[in-house]
Regions:
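Phosphate-handling DNA/RNA-contact segment within nucleic-acid enzymes
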Residues: 1-77
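Acidic, metal-coordinating catalytic cores used for nucleic-acid/nucleotide bond scission
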Residues: 61-63, 82-91
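Replication-associated primase and helicase/ATPase modules
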Residues: 40, 71, 76-81, 91-145
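Short glycine-/acidic-enriched loop or helix-start segments at secondary-structure transitions
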Residues: 50-51, 90-92
Length: 145
């Protein structure tokens, strides 16, 4: 079991309160249809806002257990929707999955996250996203330097 809490006060010291336990779990694993595209997000509340096939990382890093499950289940399209401050992590994930010939979309959230913008606004951004090309990946890498 895993629990998390979120503050709705803008001036809160911590936005999220996660337990100090291993995060090596796949959030909402029982509800994921591995035959469809998946969306990788940072937190549980982001996954709830996305609604369909969203997997929270409980942070910014993707653990090997999730990578293995994605590969084992032959997921073809991976949408990466991490906050803007996690662009470097998004790029690493994208690069990894592109090297395995997967279709990757990085969803540009601007300065928001799915839980703040809501399902409809997120879905619009997801629909507008395009498959990541090598050239666009290099642009993102340049931005991070």
């Amino acid at each position: 079991n895993f629990f998390t809490g979120r503050s709705y006060y803008k001036d809160a010291t911590y936005k999220h309160n996660n337990p100090r336990v291993s995060k090596d779990i796949i959030g909402f694993d029982l509800y994921i249809n591995w035959d469809e595209p998946i969306t990788i997000v940072e937190g549980v509340f982001d996954a709830i806002a996305v609604r369909h096939n969203a997997i929270p990382l409980f942070g910014k890093l993707m653990l090997d257990s999730l990578k293995t499950k994605i590969i084992k289940n032959k997921v073809n399209r991976i949408n990466i929707a991490l906050d803007s401050d996690a662009l470097e992590h998004s790029i690493k994930m994208a690069e990894y999955f592109m090297s395995l010939d997967k279709q990757v979309h990085i969803v540009d959230l601007g300065e928001s996250d799915p839980s703040e913008m809501g399902h409809e606004n997120f879905q619009d951004l997801l629909d507008e996203s395009k498959p990541l090309t090598f050239g666009k990946l290099m642009e993102y890498k340049f931005i991070c330097k």
